[in-house]
Amino acid sequence: MERMDIIIWLLAVVIVLTTLMIFLHLKTLKIIRLLFPISKELSKKSCVFPWKKKWTKNYPPSSMYP
């Protein structure tokens, strides 16, 4: 029974962390950088959160498309 309690507790922690990352991803990014230095290197390359990257810089203006 103790193993089931640990699994349920871990699932709850994962759910809480994912919701925090969705709604408060800027604040959790700072916390993650403090906890995991490896993710700091990844976030510099914008691999962790690709939606923060402005894709419009690499593409021509929308007026060129039909």
From Swiss-Prot:
Entry membrane topology: Single-pass membrane protein
Domain of life: Eukaryota
Organism of derivation: Loxodonta africana (African elephant)
GO BP term, pick one: ATP biosynthetic process
Biological function: Subunit 8, of the mitochondrial membrane ATP synthase complex (F(1)F(0) ATP synthase or Complex V) that produces ATP from ADP in the presence of a proton gradient across the membrane which is generated by electron transport complexes of the respiratory chain. ATP synthase complex consist of a soluble F(1) head domain - the catalytic core - and a membrane F(1) domain - the membrane proton channel. These two domains are linked by a central stalk rotating inside the F(1) region and a stationary peripheral stalk.
Protein family: Belongs to the ATPase protein 8 family.
Localization in the cell: Mitochondrion membrane
Protein name: ATP synthase F(0) complex subunit 8
Main location: mitochondrion
Coiled coil: none
